[in-house]
Amino acid sequence: VLACGVVLLALFAPALVFGARASDDIPWHFIWLQSYLDAVRHGELYPRWMPDAMAGMGSPAFYFYPPFATMFFALVDMIFLHQLPLAYVIAVSACAMGLASAAFFYSWARNFASVRVSALLGLAYAAAPYHLLTDYYNRGALGEYAAYVWVPLIFHAAHRYLVTAGVRWLALLAAAVTGLFFTHLLSAMIVGPVIAAYVLLALFGRQRRGNAGPGITVTLASMVAVALLAVGVAGLYFIPALTLFDAANTAALYARPIEATRLFARLSVHDNPVVTRYTLFAAIYLALTAYLLAEYLRARRRAAVAPAGLGTSGATVLMWTVVTALCGLFMWGKLGFVFEAPSPYRSLQFLSRLLIVVEFVLLTLVAVVFAVLPAPAERQRIASVLLLVFAGLLVYQALALFKKFEHMPIAVNEVALSPRVQYRITPPEYYPKGAPFASAVDQLLPQLAPHLDASEQAWIVDGSGRIETVAQSHGDFVLRVTAATAVSVAIRQFYFPGWVAQDQQGRRLPVTAATPFRFATVQVGAGTHTLRIAREPLPVEGWAKKLSSLSLALLLMVLGALGWAARRRASRAAPAMSPATLNRSR
């Protein structure tokens, strides 16, 4: 176990030495962490609007992007007393997430395999190339990267509940499900069906073997109720995100059709390196799955398979194989109807995301195969093949990391100094809807040039008048306007639902997006006006908060009731103590 931890830390050495560096999404996480820390300093623990983003013109990113990763970064920043540069806060946080994912997969694998095998599988899970090299080092997709933490924990909690009927495992299941939905909604969407399939298969297998414990109906109802309530707790995040999805420039998410991301096509190391790399990973995983299935079937024909336990039956082995095969077909672009409108999986964006499932399933299959094949010769042969492949993947990643960091200076972080981070330019999907903005930052900055470093926080858009005074604090504006005619007043914040305006007499005024750049704009008549323009929570935020609170209360009640019922069953099942035994116990 210690050796596996050392290897994993070695793979994180570049991150810990250089900090978070250039990758696809890392700039966003710099920006979001900066904005989140600013919001916390203003007393907001879960902000939705980022008034300091987009060069101080505001962004709704926190309405849509899951909050867990950013909040975890902020926690790490607090633990280090705000002394670490943000690049190292993110790197240390990612390392902690990687270690946690390894530990949780180890716990999951221990249901089937030995300590040594489980430790190696935990290392392989944390250092799997899509997980580590792609999601952290190359893409910087830290929400998706963090989702790897929760997946084995969900399976482990569900499995232990099926084995022991212990309510504490249901509580852990609820926490992990809520965590996954707060971390990465797309990962929850693709992992959810696999979790459901495993639970149903294991539950019916337990019933056939006649295992003691609550009946199948009670067990299934308990797990479904807890899972649904756990999802409801996360409604605080995803209900506003889904409800307001069309209020931002979210069409930018689908500028590239999902069909164009299929693997096993247009392969070229030079012309299409990303798809080629993902295809290599997928091909290796599919080949290993086929090999493990062949070894299992060979042993089964010779009746050299250990008696099946929960999660180690032939049906379970087949299920893991089918899941990997289906993911392979999906990534190849087959069965494309699954990703066509109105399917929610249309929002997956990249078919390569299914590698999240494939890496987990393959390593789980390894643990199961080692559990059911007791012959030392077979185990040795399988271990040799797997170690050879995994060692090759580790070497591949080490070489890729060496190439990435070979000439990179430690003292200068190009991400932190980039104009995108300096001006906190958010991804295009969070631009104001309908604004004629370029997605490339080098084209966007000239468009925003008149407002980038402007001290002007409000101005007259239409009509005759002037702004006498402007006071602005974290997106809350107070203006004094003198108008000779009716005027339209714009503030230096982009429009998004939630802006409200009020004059000195307490009358509410409508806020619109009346300018080409979609700045929040208020119309007032002739005269002198004192206006307060600020954001207030949208009704959907209130509904989401109430649903989340109600779900949490019901979840605690359900867990409490199930715990009480379990203790009552245990007390009834306990044999009565004889008087002599009772006296001795006293």
Per-segment meaning from a language model:
Residues 34, 83, 184, 207, ...:
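Residue-identity detector for glutamine
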Residues 1-409, 529-535, 541-580, 584-586:
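Membrane-embedded transmembrane-helix bundle of lipid-linked glycan/lipid transferases
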Residues 403-468:
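Membrane-interface segments at or immediately adjacent to transmembrane helices
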Residues 40-41, 123-126, 325-327, 332-335, ...:
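A generic short-segment signal for beta-strand/edge and adjacent turn/coil regions
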Residues 12-13, 38-39, 112, 121-122, ...:
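Generic detector of short, locally flexible boundary/turn motifs and exposed helical patches
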Residues 451-570:
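Active-site-proximal, structured, solvent-exposed surfaces of multi-pass membrane proteins
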